[in-house]
Amino acid sequence: MVDFAGWSMPVQYSSIVSEHLGTREGVGLFDVSHMGRVVVEGDQAAEWLESMLTRQVRDLSVGRSRYTLITGVDNTDETVQCDGDPVILDDAIVARLANLEGGGHRFSIVVNASNRPRVVRWLKACLPQEGVRLHDTTEETAMIAVQGPLVFGRVQEGILEGPLRNVFSSEILEKVAALKNYGVLETEFDGKPVLVSRSGYTGEDGVEIISSSLSAVMLWERLLEHNTTRPCGLGSRDTLRLEAAMPLYGHELCETTDPFSAGLGFAVNVDGRNFPGADGIRIRRGAGGRCRVGLVFDSRRAARTGDHVLLSEDGTESVCGEITSGSFSPTSERGIALAVVDRVVGNPGQELEVLVRGTRLPVKVVSLPFYRRSHQ
């Protein structure tokens, strides 16, 4: 167990490799209750979030979610304003829930554990005097990710036989299985509301379930009762997301990251919008001389964050980038890494070197992601 943003978290239950491969081949169960969970609601909730997030939300249908960035400006903690150098406070998933009975809008936002205090403080500071309410539900809820090709199991006599069958009725399970990627469903477990999202952080099919903290142990135990399911810790979650080329705050993005160079341009809608730091991000669009790439080693050795990427040409050597995340890949059985490099050396097939603890290791640029599931 390790401390992670104030939460006691397991790095592994058995081994990182076995948990990783178990998720790729069966079902991995992840307690991700450390992630921050916020509910935003009110008559002006959609309009307010439209002014706070880098992705549009007014066109988000009920029952749908999307990836976004939460931005501020260079003095975010002191002053609420939109002008100034952009600061990326976090990346997040925003979901549109069923409207309130009185007609107001409801949204769920999931943020990173380490950034939750600052993000919640910033959002609360930006709230209008009326029309929007924000509630940090992290302490009163839990979040469990169920990931892998056998999450829904196989159909036996018209019934899905995966671990979710231990949690939901056949009728609800059919609705969950019918969700498209980033679809969400509000339902119940143990007589209490739950939010089920067809999403994850592993590159596999699966769902993430937000439940009452009072029901979390029962939910976890019910899911573990299925013979395809195994518990997984932070270690395998990181290697799985790396193979899927999913960004991690503090690695692929930080306060000063240019989202376009980091491969996150899809998460930024700047045209005609004025979220915090929008002007600064608009200036960066198209101006970046760097790009995010995948690097594959020809051995099991792995680079670490901050290691230099080198280009050797005509007898000279120059630093052309740096590693943002690196690890041994249990699926391919060799080292892989995400890096930000000069755009001129970012094409697939480009041969480079990485300086790992004083040793130059050859790498090749490859298309991302490193792993793409074959079972759709």
PLM segments and residue spans:
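Conserved, structured C-terminal
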Residues: D3-F4, S8-V11, V17, T79-C82, ...
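Generic internal hydrophobic packing segments that stabilize the cores of diverse globular domains
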Residues: A46-E50, Y67, D91, R106, ...
